[in-house]
């Protein structure tokens, strides 16, 4: 990470306070938080972890829509993935931050634990197709290779879970979070 600060005095004060001062976020009962994804996505989980579940959270389809919602006043805070410990920076997010009138006010870490989710009563040996975000498929590749199922990419892990739940086909599964399993009524 890099930060550009104009003068030495400002830089010294920033460094001195960086690890001791945490900015207090202004939260009201009607505070709205926008995140990229759908309920059960890891970005949704980050939003809930940072702001709590009592705040009004809503998802949008694309990263740039988070910045747009903030700039338009449709949301008070936004949550975007910045980096992934196994794959590095999330493509395009830094450009969105630079191109829009938004700033980072905090960070939260979410442990990514992938689960194989199927319709209630489905059996692992019957699974023929697994859906997930490309990164989820990559991170679970050794397991999926042993499973021998066809792998298909979708926009994110929670969308895969939602799709499997709606189709209710015991031969389909999703790689997604435990939270997505809870939200969409799937078995792990």
Residue positions per predicted region:
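Domain-level signature for soluble enzymes in the chorismate/prephenate branch of the shikimate pathway
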Residues: 2, 6-188
């Amino acid at each position: 990470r890099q930060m550009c600060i104009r003068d030495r005095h400002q830089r010294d004060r920033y460094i001195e306070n960086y690890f001791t001062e945490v900015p207090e976020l202004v939260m009201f009962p009607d505070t709205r938080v926008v995140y990229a994804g759908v309920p059960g996505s890891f970005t949704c989980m980050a939003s809930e972890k940072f702001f709590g579940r009592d705040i009004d959270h809503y998802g949008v389809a694309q990263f740039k829509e988070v910045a747009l919602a903030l700039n338009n006043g449709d949301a008070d805070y936004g949550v975007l993935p910045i980096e992934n410990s196994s794959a590095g920076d999330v493509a395009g997010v830094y450009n969105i931050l630079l191109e829009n009138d938004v700033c980072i006010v905090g960070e939260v870490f979410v442990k990514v634990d992938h689960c194989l989710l199927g319709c209630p009563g489905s059996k692992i040996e019957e699974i023929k197709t697994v859906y997930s975000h490309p990164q989820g498929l990559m991170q679970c590749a050794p397991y999926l290779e042993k499973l021998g199922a066809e792998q298909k990419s979708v926009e994110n892990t929670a969308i895969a879970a939602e799709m499997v739940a709606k189709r209710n086909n015991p031969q389909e599964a999703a790689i997604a979070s435990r939270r997505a399993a809870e939200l969409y009524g799937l078995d792990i």
